[in-house]
From Swiss-Prot:
NCBIfam families: miaA. GO terms for molecular function: ATP binding; tRNA dimethylallyltransferase activity. The lineage of its organism: Bacteria, Pseudomonadati, Chlorobiota, Chlorobiia, Chlorobiales. This is tRNA dimethylallyltransferase. It holds the Pfam family IPPT.
Length: 309
């Protein structure tokens, strides 16, 4: 890989869920006067607060954040749109003379911003209709197995519940023979990107604890309000944002399909599975500098200082 000669336009801090990237980014921003670009595909939605682990109101008051609470869940928002809009925001922030930090763990958001996307074919209604029929008749697990056979690397970044992305990837394979072309470089912007590495068992313990904390903060009540407002969309699975881990399990509980204790256990399990997929994507599909995640506030302060040096 050729050396990058341009000055990085932003520091990127990523890693699996619950690895401490948001707290680290916030501390660096406080020390530098930076503005933070959230690369989290759920924090952009106003209605998803506790389950998306948004920064607290106090944090939002201390540091300028972008792509937090900017959309409603009825507004579709893609990784391509984020890549375009976040680059424009970065240019605007730097024009003001402020540093930029990108923080988040949504893999496609990060890949699109840092590496760019190749042009992909538009949706084909006939192919999509056929795949939707397969989904209805065979179920999402059958479509997932199909993607595993055709593109195991891409399948490793998904699971069978991500039906919109499953269908899109299978559609692209039918159109061009593979689910995605190699990313297009974006030489006009270079990034200093670090990823937080966490011992697997400790990460899983943090995930379990975080879910318990979210429940204490009112995640069940947040899910109940969403179910009351969006029951048809939840039943028909027409809004991808409402398929988010942490909400769909509680919707099932509220519909009397799962006891609460079982729903919480499933949230923990599914979040651990998501962290595993994040790690697979970040390690195999992106060029990142992996560093040891801080385990204490003191270690976080020391790491923040090292990132500034």
């Amino acid at each position: 890989m050729p050396a990058k000669t341009k000055e990085p336009v932003a520091l990127v801090i990523t890693g699996p869920t619950a690895s401490g990237k948001s707290a680290l980014a916030h501390e660096v921003a406080l020390r530098t006067g930076a503005e933070i670009i959230s690369a989290d595909s759920r924090q952009i939605y106003r209605e998803l607060t506790i389950g998306s682990a948004k920064p607290t109101p106090e944090m939002l008051g201390e540091v300028p954040y972008h792509f937090i609470n900017e959309k409603t869940i009825g507004e579709p928002y893609s990784s391509g749109a984020f890549a375009t809009e976040s680059r424009a925001r970065i240019a605007m922030i730097r024009k003001r003379g402020n540093p930029v930090i990108v923080a988040g763990g949504s893999p496609l958001y990060l890949q699109g911003l840092i590496e760019g996307f190749s042009d992909l074919p538009p949706a084909d209604p006939k192919i999509r209709e056929k795949l939707q029929k397969e989904l209805a008749e065979q179920g999402s697990r059958a479509l997932y197995r199909k993607l595993q056979d055709l593109d195991p690397e891409r399948a490793a970044t998904l699971d069978h519940t991500k039906t919109h992305r499953l269908i899109r990837n299978l559609e692209i394979i039918e159109l061009i023979g593979k689910s995605s072309k190699p990313p297009s470089p974006t030489p006009e912007m270079q990034f200093h990107a670090v990823a937080l590495n966490f011992p697997r068992e400790e990460l899983y313990q943090r995930i379990n604890l975080r879910v318990e904390e979210m429940m204490s903060e009112g995640l069940l009540q947040e899910a109940e309000a969403l179910l009351k407002k969006y029951r048809p969309e939840i039943s028909n699975r027409t809004l991808p944002a409402l398929l988010t881990v942490g909400y769909q399990e509680l919707f099932d509980h509220l519909e009397r399909k799962t006891p609460l204790e079982g729903a919480v256990t499933l949230i923990q399990q599914h979040t651990r599975n998501y962290a595993k997929r994040q790690l697979t994507f970040l390690r195999n599909r992106m060029q990142l500098n992996w560093i040891q995640a801080p385990l204490t506030a003191q270690e976080r302060t020391e790491l923040a200082e090292s990132l500034l040096s």
